[in-house]
């Protein structure tokens, strides 16, 4: 265990295999083929509009005339994800379904030259750093090394920032990026709170970028600069999360330096 993490973090060792973003497409295709070959039917361009949990019917609208607008079911696995959480809340209220609030999970993506983390990478490619307080815990996740890039994705009408790493070393840039995820307990309506926090973090739907050393935003694997708004200080983070919560993230980063 590298000496520099002992005062601040816990290190847990798990087996890790790096697939690479460039090879993940093939795994997705194989997974899809396996399911369809075994009788699973995917309904694309289809939106569920209502679920009757009493009589076991699903209503949906589809651009594909092959599918009916109503279908019955014997068993239902209901998973809406974050994009469908409002729909899930509507159904829970309509049918008086029991729900449980979960802690808020929100964070930032951090990027730095890889040599700063090489001791950890030599132990585990996707190393995990943890730090815990009374009602808040922080952890690193989704670590990318060697040929590591930040990519912008459109999520709910705003930009979100994801890390990618290619297996093909012709793309090598010797950078490391990972998310710093903060879990906050005791917040009423956690998804609404986090959605508002993201809006405050962004400017015109685009994420903000801050570098204390005035580094320019990184490039994507296609050679384009990552779309973002460069800011001069941490005020957007303070405004979005509150000074106390923002300082937890700042302290997490300082403990790595």
Task: Give the predicted meaning of each segment.
Residues 1-257:
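Residues forming the flavin
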């Amino acid at each position: 265990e590298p000496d520099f993490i002992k005062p601040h973090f816990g290190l847990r060792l798990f087996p890790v295999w790096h697939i690479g973003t460039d090879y993940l497409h093939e795994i997705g295709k194989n997974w899809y083929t396996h399911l369809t070959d075994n009788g699973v039917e995917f309904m694309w361009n289809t939106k569920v509009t209502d679920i009757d949990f009493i009589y076991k019917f699903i209503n949906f609208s589809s651009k594909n005339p092959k599918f009916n607008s109503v279908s019955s079911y014997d068993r239902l696995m209901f998973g809406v994800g974050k994009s469908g959480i409002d729909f899930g809340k509507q159904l829970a209220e309509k049918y008086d379904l029991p729900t449980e609030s979960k802690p808020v999970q929100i964070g930032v993506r951090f990027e730095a030259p890889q040599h700063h983390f090489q001791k950890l990478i030599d132990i585990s490619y996707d190393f995990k750093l943890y730090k815990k307080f009374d009602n808040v815990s922080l952890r690193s996740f989704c670590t990318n090394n060697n040929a590591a890039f930040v990519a912008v994705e459109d999520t709910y009408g705003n930009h979100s920032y994801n890390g990618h790493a290619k297996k093909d070393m012709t793309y090598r840039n010797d950078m490391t990026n990972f998310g710093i995820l903060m879990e906050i307990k005791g917040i009423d309506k956690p998804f609404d709170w986090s959605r508002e926090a993201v809006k405050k973090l962004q400017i015109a739907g685009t994420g903000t970028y801050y570098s204390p050393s005035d580094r320019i935003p990184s490039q994507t694997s296609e050679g384009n600069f990552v779309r973002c708004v460069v800011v001069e200080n941490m005020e957007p983070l303070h405004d979005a999360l509150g000074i106390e919560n923002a300082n937890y993230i700042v302290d997490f980063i300082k403990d790595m330096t």
